Design a protein with these regions (language model features):
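Internal alpha/beta domain cores that form substrate/cofactor-binding pockets in large enzymes
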Residues: 2-4, 27-29, 58-77, 82, ...
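A generic structural signal for well-ordered alpha-helical segments
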Residues: 19, 52-57, 128
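Donor/substrate-binding cores of folate-linked one-carbon enzymes
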Residues: 22, 81-196
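N-terminal beta-loop-helix "entrance" segment that forms/cooperates
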Residues: 35-53
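Single conserved hydrophobic/aromatic residue that forms the stacking wall/gate
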Residues: 198-207
Length: 207
């Protein structure tokens, strides 16, 4: 499938690697801009950019997508599907409606639980017994789209959020590669999120 990938940090880079390995046509990559890092403030590329350039894939780093400045370029790229993993920019309706199969997002929680940022850290801080990954069909809301697929992941009470995140990343990359061909085959049934399960939890204080 011809995919436009949007993502920035390590988890996105691992997902992008998995899509390359699965043989998908990554027509281009959108990521955030290079940032100064460390005491010497060395300008550093996002992990996703490094992976894309290593594969010879065009990389775009606009400040925003919301002003419509990238609409024409995205249409010209003619993606069948846009895959978003921790990109960091909001996709406007004009972008969401461009691909044949729309836009999907990998979120590292069992939606609708822990919508928004840092879901793995929240799960650990709150002492949850499990977390998971969800892949949703994106709409104009924040993590509000219909869920295409989810997979539960047990949390070891002794593991750190970093250790759990590594496991979640591996599962997320695998599930993403399973979902893409299923989308093309039309074998997935989008499920609306159960709004009764939405809650905002405060982290548990630990001594």
């Amino acid at each position: 499938m011809r995919i436009l990938f949007m993502g920035t940090p390590d988890i996105a880079a691992e997902c992008l690697k998995a899509l390359y390995a699965a043989g998908h046509d990554i027509c281009a990559v959108y990521t955030r801009r290079d940032k100064p890092v460390g005491r010497k403030q060395v300008l550093t590329a996002p992990p996703v950019k490094e992976v894309a350039l290593a594969h010879g894939t065009p990389v775009f780093q606009p400040r925003t997508l919301r002003d419509g400045s990238e609409d024409e370029n995205i249409r010209a790229l003619a993606p069948e599907l846009i895959v978003v993993v921790a990109y960091g920019c909001i996709l406007p309706k004009s972008v969401l409606e461009t691909p044949k199969y729309g836009c999907i997002n990998l979120h590292v929680s069992l939606l609708p639980k822990y919508r928004g940022s840092a879901p793995v850290q929240w799960a650990v801080l709150n002492g949850d017994a499990e977390t998971g990954v969800s892949i949703m069909q994106m709409d104009e809301g924040l993590d509000t789209g219909d869920v295409l697929c989810c997979e539960k992941i047990a949390i070891d009470p002794e593991e750190t959020s970093g250790e759990l995140f590594d496991r979640v990343t591996a599962v997320g990359a695998r599930v993403l590669c399973e979902v893409v061909p299923a989308i093309a085959a039309g074998t997935l049934t989008p499920q609306p999120q159960d709004l009764s399960l939405i809650h905002i939890s405060e982290p548990t204080r630990r001594s």
